[in-house]
Curated annotation (Swiss-Prot):
Lineage start: Eukaryota, Metazoa, Chordata, Craniata, Vertebrata
Gene (name only): MC1R
Subcellular location: Cell membrane
Primary location class: membrane
Residues annotated as transmembrane: 38-63, 73-93, 119-140, 164-183, 192-211, 241-266, 280-300
The protein's name: Melanocyte-stimulating hormone receptor
């Protein structure tokens, strides 16, 4: 039925190519090769999305409430929370609409479903791009605060941060509109993959350089106080562990999704790739998990923000 086809489109334009989908059916029929498909229950997916939604709403509310948090750094953190909020919210909306359509609780025309499909895809893609951009912006902000500490407040002024934020949002919306419109072109998917790799390299280079400077500074303090080297080694190990966790979480949560896009371009008809395509919802779930972890890494470690968060929660009761 036409409506059933429209319902399936809500699963996302980037899920797989038509060639890959049709070939998947042939592969199963002719070879019977087993595919490892991890099923993510809709209830679990929606629950994770709800946790992310609540967490990031609290971050946005705390930053908005406390004027002491209206600095460039917290503006970037707030925008990261807002983009993560949209990532989880758009995926929850898509899943909820699919469930309502499949159960017959929501009946509408195919054209309306198609428009909703396009809107959700643009919202999801733009919020994902924003999330990646603001992770990079936070890394740049921290880098400047360490290497240009005396000039930090003159470099990272609030108006400059606001202009950067506006540019990121506008560029993300325009780019996502083009990506969703031309999603069946290999160049578009490769652009997304290259963008992810660029953000990964940027964050790795900046944070490794910051770690090296911190270790150098700690070594200087130790030499000044004539302490033993194990303390310096312990600091270096802790810093390396923190850096590994930060970049590791980023790569593990985002990497599979962009690996999926890469395989769609290079091996849409291969049986192994077709099996990977069946786990698309797992990759989305990992991104949702990243939106849950981001506030723990970037926001809730701030004592000022935690104090404001307590005030927000107390005022809400």
């Amino acid at each position: 039925m036409p409506m059933q086809g429209a319902q399936r489109k809500l699963l996302g334009s980037l899920n797989s190519t038509p060639t890959a989908t049709s070939n998947l059916g042939l592969a199963a029929n002719h070879t019977g090769a087993p595919c490892l498909e991890v099923s993510i229950p809709d209830g679990l997916f929606l629950s994770l999305g709800l946790v992310s939604l609540v967490e990031n709403v609290l971050v946005v509310a705390a930053v908005a409430k406390n004027r002491n948090l209206h600095s460039s750094m917290y503006c970037f953190i707030c925008c990261l929370a807002l983009s993560d909020l949209l990532v989880s919210g758009s995926n929850m909306l898509e899943t909820a609409v699919i469930l309502l359509l499949e159960t017959g609780a929501l009946a509408t025309r195919t054209s309306v479903v198609q428009q909703l499909h396009n809107t959700i895809n643009v919202l999801t893609c733009s919020s994902m791009l924003c999330s990646l951009c603001f992770l990079g912006a936070i890394a740049v902000d921290r880098y400047i605060s360490i290497f240009y500490a005396l000039r930090y407040h003159s470099i990272m002024t609030l108006p400059r941060a606001q202009r950067a934020i506006a540019a990121i949002w506008v560029a993300s919306v325009l780019s996502s509109t083009l990506f969703i419109t031309y999603y069946d072109h290999a160049a578009v998917l490769l652009c997304l993959v290259v963008f992810f790799l660029a953000m990964l390299v940027l964050m790795a280079v900046l944070y490794v350089h910051m770690l090296a400077r911190a270790c150098q500074h700690a070594h200087g303090i130790i030499r000044l106080h004539k302490r033993q080297t194990p303390a310096h080694q312990g600091f270096g190990l802790r810093g390396a562990a923190t850096l590994t966790i930060l970049l590791g979480i980023f790569f593990l949560c985002w990497g599979p999704f962009f690996l999926h896009l890469t395989l769609v371009v290079f091996c849409p008809q291969h049986l192994t790739c077709s099996c990977i395509f069946k786990n698309f919802k797992v990759f989305l779930t990992l991104i949702i998990c990243n939106t849950i972890i981001d506030p723990l890494i970037y926001a809730f470690r701030s004592q000022e923000l935690r104090r404001t968060l307590k005030e927000v929660l107390l005022c809400s009761w």
